[in-house]
Amino acid sequence: GGGSTYTPELIDGFARLRDTLPVEELVLVDPAADRLELVGGLARRIFAKQGHPGTISWTGDLDAGVDGADAVLLQLRVGGQAARNQDETWPLECGCVGQETTGAGGLAKALRTVPVVLDIAERVRRRNPDAWIVDFTNPVGIVTRALLTAGHRAVGLCNVAIGFQRKFARLLGVAPGEVTLEHIGLNHLTWERAVRVGGEDVLPGLLAEHGEAIAEDLRMPRTLVDRLGVVPSYYLRYYYQHDAVVRELRTKPSRAAEVAAIERELLERYGDPALDEKPELLSRRGGAFYSEAAVDLTSSLLGDTGEVRIVNTLNGGTLPFLPDDAVIEVPAAVTAQGAKPLPVRPLEPLFAGLVANVTAYEHLALEAALKGGRERVFQALLSHPLIGQIAYAEKLTDDLIAHNREHLAWA
C-alpha cells in the first residue's frame, strides 16, 4: 500500500521521529504505478525538507521491495474505494449497518483481504524470515489473527488508542506521554476503562468536566457515556445506536464516496513539485497519529525495548473467557520476540458478552476467508450481533458474493 494517500502521514512521522526510529532505507511498494510515482515524489521531498538522511525508493515488484527488510508495514485496500463504497451501501438494503470493518461490509473486506495479505506475508517470510509485519490493514483483528495463525511474525495496529491518548492529554493540559490508557477489547470494539496520569485514574474527573465534549466527539449521548462509566470507541456507535446509524447512513453519501473525492484532490496536490510537507487536507482522510503509533511500535520490535504499546496480538489467556488464539487489542510489552499483553482486570459482563460474540464471529469470518464457501459466509453473518436473523443473513450472503465475486476464488 505504498501508493496510499495515507503514506505521506507515515513519511512525516518517520522524518520527525528519526531519533526514535532511524530509517536508513524506505521502499514503497504498490501495483498502482501512477499513484506510487506521485506519493514517492512527495515522500522524498518531505525527507529532504526535514533533513532526513535516509533513502526512499518505490517499486511495483513486491519481492524486490521487501528484500532485506527489517519490517514490512501493510496498509492495503483490495478493490480500492469502489469496493469500500459497496461495503458501505448494499448492507443498508437489509436494514443493517454499512461499514468497511463492521458487520456484513467488514466481512466482505476480510474475505477480499486475508488471502492477499497471507500471500504477501509468505513472500516476506521467504525473503526475510526474521522481518516483522506491522498490519494497519482493516479489519485489523481478523487480518492479524490470520497472520498469527499462519505463524507469521506480526502485530496489528490501530490509531484509535493513540487518538484518545492525544485528545485526553489536550483536555487535561498534560503531555501525551504522561497519559496511559486502560484500553481493552477487540479491534474497533474497545473501551477506555481508566485514564491514568502519574499512576492516578483521572477518568471520573475527565468525564465530569469534559463529558459533554467527549460524547459529542463520539456522536453518542452524554447519558450513555455516563452510564457506561468508560469511554467507548467510536465504532461502538454501530452497536449502541445501530438503527439510528442505519437511518443516518441512508440519507447521505457514503464515507467511501467522500474519501474518494478527498483522494482525488490529494493526489493532484501530491503531484505539485513545490509541495514538501503533508497537506492539511490529509487530516480529513482519517488516520490521525497513526504514523507516530507505527514508529513507536516498529522501534520497540526492532530495538527490543519492552515498552508498552496498545496493539492487536494473541489473547493467550489475558481474557480467560476468550480462546487463547483470539486476537485482542490491549496494552502489551513489545520486544524483539513480539507483543505480550499486560495483565488486565476482569472485563465487566456489560462489555464481555459483546466481546465474546464478536470474537466468535471473527473466528467464523477467518474460516470463511481461508476456506471459502457460501455456508461459511452465511454462518459468519448469522453469528454477527448486528445481523443475527436468518432472513438477513441469507440475503446478505447472496449480496456479498454477488458484489465480490471477482475477489473470491471459490465463488
Region roles according to the model:
Residues 8, 132-201:
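Rossmann-fold dinucleotide-binding core
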Residues 18-21, 47-53, 126, 172-174:
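Short helix-capping segments at alpha-helix termini
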Residues 19-46:
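NAD(P)-binding Rossmann-fold cofactor-contacting core
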Residues 55-68:
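Short acidic low-complexity segments
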Residues 78, 82-150:
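Rossmann-fold NAD(P)-binding glycine/threonine-rich loop
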